[in-house]
Design a protein with these regions (language model features):
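Residue position within the beta-strands of beta-propeller blades
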Residues: 33-37, 79-82
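Multi-bladed beta-propeller domains
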Residues: 4-30, 38-41, 51-68, 97-127
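Structural motif
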Residues: 1-2, 43-49, 87-94
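Serine-hydrolase catalytic core recognition
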Residues: 67-316
Length: 316
């Protein structure tokens, strides 16, 4: 966070460190404080903080592990905190401005999930194919998962620049449904995604397919190498950017992926809206090679699996 004059002159850098400010929630000009969300405690978590304009008195206001969202009172006297983590379904807490609990507004009875053999997701680490970077993935196992047995895998992907999938938050009910059908459900944050700073995020600039395809392949191969994934039964699915991800896996990574469901995909970003695409890819006239490499159409000759494409008549 930086403090500037209205004419753009830098007054002071307020925050620093190897973590990301995710969102500025409010600026209290009278008391010279900034309230913001950040992943300082963990790359997998959004927590609520305050700090003075002078860069001092950085204070964590949400002490519960997990992913938080807050609604700050207009008079800065307190806030409503909504959070969950991998082991705790959504809770809604009323707190004072120091982060002290005033009242539990509502919370979910976890025992209701356990009646359905809820499978608690696990965050894992694996290495990139060049061993340069440790990446994060998240797995939902089938109920009664047994080590030594290989399972079919569904990779749920998105992978667009600056986004993040792997979080410490309550799991998806759709992933639970798939796990209950006997699948391992796997997602990962490839190089070029969010949570690890600008250098990591900018790795995908100019070619959105390069690390997305390589790092997803590395993640799947890791599951195969530790003996839990059936290499003959690997599928992918996703929506929008995830639809693109699925198309890419079934073509560029056709030797790994057998089947996919692609919903509302962008198969060639030259055909998508420029306001989104050009901030990650530059202009088509200046980056033909990057647009060609990013396009799913460049790899259709490799396609050999089964792909279901679902689309409407319009998108953004």
């Amino acid at each position: 966070i930086y403090l500037h004059t209205f004419k753009g002159k830098l007054i002071k850098q307020i925050t620093s460190g190897n973590w990301e400010v995710k969102k500025i929630v409010a600026v209290d000009e009278k008391n010279e404080k900034v309230y913001f969300m950040a992943n300082k405690k963990s790359v997998f978590e959004n927590r609520f903080y305050s700090i003075g304009f002078n860069g001092k008195d950085l204070t964590l206001l949400t002490k519960e592990p997990g992913s938080h969202s807050v609604k700050l009172f207009p008079d800065y006297s307190g806030f409503l905190d909504t959070y969950s983590n991998l082991n705790t379904p959504s809770r809604h807490l009323l707190k004072d401005i120091e982060g002290n609990l005033i009242k539990v507004i509502s919370e979910t009875d976890k025992s209701q999930f356990e009646e359905y053999d809820w499978s608690y997701p696990e965050i894992i680490k694996f290495q990139t194919d060049d061993n340069s970077t440790a990446l994060d993935g998240i797995i939902t196992y089938p109920p009664n998962f047994k080590k030594g047995k290989r399972y079919p895998v569904i990779v749920h992907g998105y992978g667009m620049p600056g986004t993040q999938i792997v979080y410490n938050r309550w799991g998806s009910t759709w992933n639970q449904f798939l796990a209950h059908q006997g699948y391992i459900v796997f997602s990962l944050d490839a190089r070029g995604m969010s949570g690890r700073g600008e250098d990591f995020k900018n790795l995908s600039y100019g070619d959105m397919s390069k690390y997305l395809s390589r790092d997803t392949a590395a993640g799947v191969k890791h599951l195969i190498s530790i003996g839990i994934a059936d290499p003959e039964k690997i599928g992918a699915w996703g929506w929008s950017g995830g639809g693109y991800f699925t198309g890419l896996m079934l073509t560029k990574n056709a030797d790994l992926f057998d089947v996919g469901v692609s919903v509302a995909p962008v198969m060639d970003f030259r055909l998508y809206d420029s306001i989104y695409t050009e901030r990650s890819m530059g202009l088509p006239k200046d980056n033909k090679a990057g647009y060609d490499s990013t396009s799913v159409l460049s790899y259709v000759d490799r396609f050999k699996g089964k792909l279901l494409v679902i689309h409407g008549t319009g998108d953004d």
